[in-house]
Amino acid sequence: MKILIADDHASIFEPFKFFFETAFKNKKHSFTTVINCKEAVNEIERKKLKNSTFDFAVIDISMPGYAEKDIHNGSDLCKYLNQEMPNCKTFINTAILENFTLFDLVQNLKPDGIAVKSDMKAEDYIAAFEKIWQGEIFRSSSVDNKVNEIWGYETLANETNRTIITCLANGYKIKEIANELQLTEVSINKRISKIKKALEINETTILREVKRRGYV
C-alpha cells in the first residue's frame, strides 16, 4: 500500500504511519511524507513517471501552496491528486471548523473521508481508514453536523449565497460583490433578503449572526 501523508506539521507523520500499520496489518506499507504542496506535486509526478500511483492520501488543508501550479492549499492539492490519480483514496484532515468551508470541501472535493482533527482519537483514525478502504465514506461528527446544518437551510446550500455571505464577512461592498459574481446589485440585494429571511435575522445582525453560528 503506497501512502502519501501531506501536512506542514511533520510531528504527525509517525502517528499516522502507526494508524495505517495498525489498520492494515497484513499489507506492506510504503510511506511518502511531504510538508507542502510543491513537495506533494513533485512526489505525485515522480510516481506517474514510474507508471505508479498512490493508494491512499492524507491531506491537511492549511499547507503552503505551489503557485507555479496554481495550487494554493491542501484543497487544491486534493483536486490535483483526484485528477492525476483518480483511484487514490483521499482523506482530508483539518482543524477548520467553519460550516461553509467544511460544506464546500465535502461538496467540491468529494473526498473519501474528511475529519476535523479535534473530533479524532487514534482509534477513530484507524477505524476511518479501514472504512474508507472498504469503499465507505467517512465524516467525523463535526463535519456531519455542520454539513447537515447547511442542508437544513435550502438558501445556504446555494453556492452563490454562501459566497455572498463570505464576501460580506470579509468587508466587501454590495457593488464589489456584484462585480465579483457578475450579478447586478439588485440581484445581490434580493439574495441577501432571502438569506436574512431564511436565518430569521435582520439587517443589523446578519454578519454578527453568521459569525456567531460559525458559518464563516
Per-segment meaning from a language model:
Residues T33-F56, Y66:
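Acidic, metal-coordinating helix/loop segments flanking the phosphotransfer/catalytic sites
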Residues A10-I35:
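Two-component/phosphorelay signaling modules centered on CheY-like receiver
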Residues N148-N189:
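Helix-turn-helix DNA-binding segment
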Residues F54-L81:
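Conserved phosphotransfer microenvironments
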Residues L77-F103, I114:
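A short, hydrophobic beta-strand element within the central beta-sheet of small alpha/beta folds
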